[in-house]
Amino acid sequence: MDPYKVIIRPVVTEKAISLIEKENKLTFIVDRRATKTDIKKAIEEIFNVKVEKVNTLITPKGEKKAYVKLKPEYSASEIAARLGLF
């Protein structure tokens, strides 16, 4: 799957911003057919970072949400700033 088709958009909520600051996690809405491995590869390729783990869930709206934890040597705040979240 094309990395740019896997990631649909970042999530910008109070919880998502809190996770960026406290747990070094980014939150995205992703393609419903994407696997955790697809999501990990897409994030690593697009943002040039290393991913520690990916947690996913299906929202009541039917969208797939991914919580992506970055390795400690990378900053989620930096990526969020590049995306224009701050």
Swiss-Prot record:
SUPFAM superfamilies registered for this protein in UniProt: Ribosomal proteins S24e, L23 and L15e (SSF54189)
UniProtKB keywords: Ribonucleoprotein, Ribosomal protein, RNA-binding, rRNA-binding
RNA-binding is among the record's keywords: yes
Gene Ontology MF annotations: rRNA binding; structural constituent of ribosome
GO annotations of cellular component type: ribonucleoprotein complex; ribosome
Family to which this protein belongs: Belongs to the universal ribosomal protein uL23 family.
Record-linked NCBIfam families: PRK14548.1 (NF011118), uL23_arch (TIGR03636)
Stated name of the protein: Large ribosomal subunit protein uL23
Originating gene: rpl23
